[in-house]
Each structure stands twice: as structure tokens, then as C-alpha cells.
């Protein structure tokens, strides 16, 4: 096989999801990093370019930095498999599964891994929703979120029983399945995994009550601590848990797993990002930097792991 530097590489960026802007920023950073190191990399936006024709245009490999639906949900992965183009990140099944928070959590739960207690509501069952019963079981506050939307789109913190129905209705505008979860009041962190190696956790301290879209991409007041401070014992437990969560859903190459702690300090798995952000605010590069990866080295490593 030709060395990677001699291959024509498509950097897939942009796309049509709610996270298009973030993907364009990530893609630009990845493209620059590859070109700076002598790779023959080209920006390809599936919104404007038929990805199914990449191979006949001489492309030999794809760096997928599309975020959200269409890019992280198995769709683009299926197209690339179909035309036989190796690509970065997770395969079709894992991408499709992890885009669906509810089914990801059901799988983790089936393997005995810890998740938040939750109720599942769909468009078909929303009329049967009994807010009082839900609050009795899960307590207050509650977190309501669509099962399939990234970048914290459609999230609501519910502080009173009478707010629950509106929060569910809002989330249902983004997806037909909604999760109502117990509020996790502990520490929020995200843990990158690169080539089966668990990298240092990043603790997230948002200015507001939770890590929403603004805190993720716009605010400079969100604080990050990496490595996240914890005892050696907790660190070992976290690394083991994250590696198991990564393996259970079948991740490959690179992914980022979000974890929170409950009021008693117990870890709870939240979700998987199979195409983590690679912007100046992004957490994967922050973490990788603490173990010696420059941004450019990280990008090349991810490319080398493509399959």
C-alpha cells in the first residue's frame, strides 16, 4: 500500500446537521494540520459534493470530521464502506448505535455498566406521561434530552413538576424519543480514547448550570481541568469503566466518552462522541496535549488509525 503521504485524502467537513458550523471549524483545523505536514488533503463538504464519487475522483482515504446526523450516525460510514474507501473513526454499527443515547445506555446497562436512572418517552407515549409519577421515581431536578441530537441541542433542566411536559415537548421537536433522567449533581467530565488508550479525563466546569451549546462552543468562561483531579483509586476505576464502555459499543480509532458523578461520587456513563470536536475549544486535543501529542501529531495519529 502507498504511504499515507502519497495518498489523496478527503477531509469530510460541514455536512447538513445542526452541528455544521462546528464541523467546518474542526475540519479547517484538521485540514491545516495535515497540509502543514505534507499530506495531500482536500476539504470535501457532503452538502455540496457527492461523497459516493470520491473514489473515482482519485481519493484513497477519508478523514471524517463531520459532527452530528449524517456524519456521526453511520450514514456517511455506509457510503464509504460501499465505495471501499478507508476512513477514520468508528464503523457503521457503532456510529448508528451511539448517535442514539437511549439504545447506547440500554446496551451499557445490559453489560452491567452504570448509567443514570431514566424514563423513556416517545411521540406515541407522550400522552401517557405522568409528571408526578416520574418525579416521585426520579426526584427533582431532572434532565430532559432528545435521544438523538448532539452538542446539547434540545436539553432542559426541569426544576418543578409542572415544567416537565414543556421540556419533553421541546425535546420531541428534535427527536421522536426523549430521555428524562435523574439529575446528576456531581462532576462532569469527558474521557478521550485514542487507539484503545484511555487519555486523561477533562473535568468541565461550566459557568451556568450545565454544559450547553454556548458553554461548549462560544463561552470563554467554561473552565476545564485536565487531568481531572481524583484519587488514584478513582482514576483506575474511571479508566477501566471508560475502556469497557468503549469496547461494549464497538468503538475504533478514536472516540470521547462523557461521564458524570452522582451526589455520592459514583461514576455514570452519559454518552459517546464518535467524531469529537477538533476546534480551539475542543477537549480531545486538550487531553492529548497532556500526554505529549501536539495537535498536528494527534491528527496524523487519527489518520493512521483509519480502516
Curated annotation (Swiss-Prot):
What is a single cellular component term in the Gene Ontology annotation?
cytosol
- Molecular function per GO: ATP binding; D-alanine-D-alanine ligase activity; metal ion binding
Q: EC?
A: 6.3.2.4
Per its UniProt record, the required cofactor names are: Mg(2+); Mn(2+)
Gene Ontology terms describing biological process? cell wall organization; peptidoglycan biosynthetic process; regulation of cell shape
Q: How is the cofactor bound?
A: Binds 2 magnesium or manganese ions per subunit.
Q: What InterPro entries does the record point to?
A: ATP-grasp, ATP_grasp_subdomain_1, D-Ala_lig_Van_CS, D_ala_D_ala, Dala_Dala_lig_C, Dala_Dala_lig_N, PreATP-grasp_dom_sf
Stretches assigned to the ATP-grasp domain: 105-304
Q: Catalyzes what?
A: 2 D-alanine + ATP = D-alanyl-D-alanine + ADP + phosphate + H(+)
**Group of enzyme by EC:** ligase
Quote the pathway field.
Answer: Cell wall biogenesis; peptidoglycan biosynthesis
What residues bind ATP, as annotated?
135-190
Which of this chain's residues are annotated to bind Mg(2+) 2?
Answer: 271, 273
Subcellular locations according to the entry: Cytoplasm
Its annotated function is as follows: Cell wall formation.
- What's the family? Belongs to the D-alanine--D-alanine ligase family.
The molecule here is called D-alanine--D-alanine ligase
Q: Which organism is it from?
A: Mannheimia succiniciproducens (strain KCTC 0769BP / MBEL55E)
From the broadest rank down, the organism's phylogenetic lineage runs: Bacteria, Pseudomonadati, Pseudomonadota, Gammaproteobacteria, Pasteurellales
Q: Which gene encodes it?
A: ddl
Amino acid at each position: 500500500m502507498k504511504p499515507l503521504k502519497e495518498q489523496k485524502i478527503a477531509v469530510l467537513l460541514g455536512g447538513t446537521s445542526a452541528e455544521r458550523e462546528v464541523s467546518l471549524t474542526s475540519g479547517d483545523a484538521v485540514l491545516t494540520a495535515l497540509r502543514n505536514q505534507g499530506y495531500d488533503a482536500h476539504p470535501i463538504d457532503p452538502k455540496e459534493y457527492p461523497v459516493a464519487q470520491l473514489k473515482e475522483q482519485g481519493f484513497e482515504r477519508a478523514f471524517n470530521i463531520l459532527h452530528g446526523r449524517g456524519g456521526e450516525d453511520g450514514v456517511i460510514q455506509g457510503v464509504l464502506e460501499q465505495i471501499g474507501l478507508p476512513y477514520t473513526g468508528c464503523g457503521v454499527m457503532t456510529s448508528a448505535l451511539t448517535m442514539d443515547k437511549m439504545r447506547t445506555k440500554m446496551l451499557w446497562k445490559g453489560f452491567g455498566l452504570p448509567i443514570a436512572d431514566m424514563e423513556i418517552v416517545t411521540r406515541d407515549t407522550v400522552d401517557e406521561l405522568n409528571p408526578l409519577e416520574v418525579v416521585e421515581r426520579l426526584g427533582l431536578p431532572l434532565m430532559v434530552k432528545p435521544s438523538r441530537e448532539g452538542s446539547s441541542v434540545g436539553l432542559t433542566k426541569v426544576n418543578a413538576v409542572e415544567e416537565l411536559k414543556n421540556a419533553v415537548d421541546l425535546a420531541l421537536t428534535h427527536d421522536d424519543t426523549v430521555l428524562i433522567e435523574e439529575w446528576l449533581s456531581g462532576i462532569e467530565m469527558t474521557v478521550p480514547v485514542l487507539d484503545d488508550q484511555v487519555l486523561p479525563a477533562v473535568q468541565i466546569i461550566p459557568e451556568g448550570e450545565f454544559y450547553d451549546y454556548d458553554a461548549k462552543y462560544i463561552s470563554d468562561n467554561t473552565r476545564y481541568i485536565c487531568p481531572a483531579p481524583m484519587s488514584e483509586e478513582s482514576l483506575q476505576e474511571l479508566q477501566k469503566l471508560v475502556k469497557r464502555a468503549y469496547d461494549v459499543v464497538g468503538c475504533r480509532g478514536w472516540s470521547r466518552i462523557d461521564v458524570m458523578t452522582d451526589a455520592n461520587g459514583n461514576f455514570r456513563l452519559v454518552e459517546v462522541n464518535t467524531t469529537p470536536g477538533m476546534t480551539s475549544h475542543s477537549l480531545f486535543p486538550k487531553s492529548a496535549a497532556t500526554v505529549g501529542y501536539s495537535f498536528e501529531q494527534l491528527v496524523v495519529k487519527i489518520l493512521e488509525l483509519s480502516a
